[in-house]
């Protein structure tokens, strides 16, 4: 009887390990956006839910910012400089990213989309 219990216990442990191994680990995704002439390029980023996303933004002319309200992200990019940051895309949906600088109308029109595909 003890051997049978041990055997069943080992089978259950192996089955649990198999289930854990089959779960997908979050992917690491990297993007480089160029900010130039009040535009982001690319202006659309697509990731999977729970991905760890690394974003580098390069300014080719002026100072810019990058904001995604739903993820509480706000970063500044100096003229001709870069900024890099990471976040976990833990919410599925489509989210607007934009420059939140208010010194002129051109910044207000600078935007793009982050698409987070659900699991």
Segments the model singles out, each with a brief description of its role:
Residues 1-9:
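Bacterial N-terminal signal peptides that target proteins for export
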Residues 12-21:
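Hydrophobic h-region of N-terminal signal peptides that target proteins for export
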Residues 22-27, 77-119:
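Extracellular/periplasmic metallocenter environments
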Residues 24-52:
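N-terminal edge beta-strand
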Residues 43-45, 72-76, 86:
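Beta-strand-rich interaction surfaces with strong enrichment in secreted/lumenal proteins
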Residues 52-58:
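Short edge beta-strand/loop segments characteristic of extracellular beta-sandwich folds
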Residues 59-63:
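Short proline/glycine-enriched turn/loop motifs at strand-loop junctions of beta-rich domains
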